[in-house]
């Protein structure tokens, strides 16, 4: 494969030799060709050769040549518009910066900026923590449902009752006794339905 290296004013002075280490190891000397004020170094290697055209404009040497050309044109078209804008004095600029600083609201240091994306406040949720005066670690609370109390009076009444126990809890009325017969269980489940209308054809 032949490697073409262009030496330009960006890298070195024109006319200087540039040789790769592979060429020195192989012992093959590079051949130099002068094209339009640029020196071209080609090293012969085995395989296919890819030769670049001799006269390349500077824009095509970039990786994104067509994109660069389009942006250069847009910059040229936008250039006169930017020059028409009036120049502001230093006093006006300082006044604008002071106004901008005053208009910015104070940021919350409690939450990082990413948490401002959420529409809710995490502190607004209900907290089920008890005050430190009431200790419930010694109470057997396994199997006790969570009870939400609205007022402090009901909370005081709850603590006056003592520790809750599953044995003292009244059984719900829908719960049937295992010793009852199946017929009595079915009688408890009977529900009166409205009378059927025979006039309506289905």
From Swiss-Prot:
Claim: Transferase is one of the keywords in the record: no
GO MF terms held by the record: SH3 domain binding
Keywords: Cytoplasm, Nucleus, Proto-oncogene, SH3-binding
GO cellular component terms, A-Z: cytoplasm; nucleus
Short sequence motif named SH3-binding, residue ranges: 163-173
GO biological process: chromosome organization; homologous chromosome segregation
Domain comment quoted from the record: The N-terminal destruction box (D-box) acts as a recognition signal for degradation via the ubiquitin-proteasome pathway.
Protein name: Putative pituitary tumor-transforming gene 3 protein
Source organism per UniProt: Pan troglodytes (Chimpanzee)
Gene this chain is encoded by: PTTG3
């Amino acid at each position: 494969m032949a490697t073409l290296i262009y030496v330009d004013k960006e890298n070195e002075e024109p006319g200087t030799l540039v040789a790769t280490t592979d060429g020195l190891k192989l012992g093959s000397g590079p051949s130099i060709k002068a094209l339009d004020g640029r020196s071209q170094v080609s090293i012969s290697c085995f395989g296919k050769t890819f030769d670049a055209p001799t006269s390349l404009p500077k824009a095509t040497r970039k990786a994104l040549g067509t994109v660069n050309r389009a942006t250069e044109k847009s910059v040229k078209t936008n250039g006169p518009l930017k020059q028409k804008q009036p120049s502001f004095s230093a006093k006006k600029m300082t006044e604008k910066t002071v106004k901008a600083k005053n208009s910015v609201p104070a940021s919350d240091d409690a939450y990082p900026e990413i948490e401002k994306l959420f529409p809710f406040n995490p502190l607004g949720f209900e907290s089920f923590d008890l005050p430190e005066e009431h200790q419930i670690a010694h109470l057997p609370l396994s199997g006790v449902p969570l009870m939400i109390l609205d007022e402090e009076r009901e909370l005081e009444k709850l603590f006056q009752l003592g520790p809750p126990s599953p044995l003292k809890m009244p059984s719900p009325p829908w719960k049937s006794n295992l010793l009852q017969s199946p017929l009595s269980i079915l009688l408890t489940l009977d529900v009166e339905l409205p009378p059927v209308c025979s006039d309506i054809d289905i």
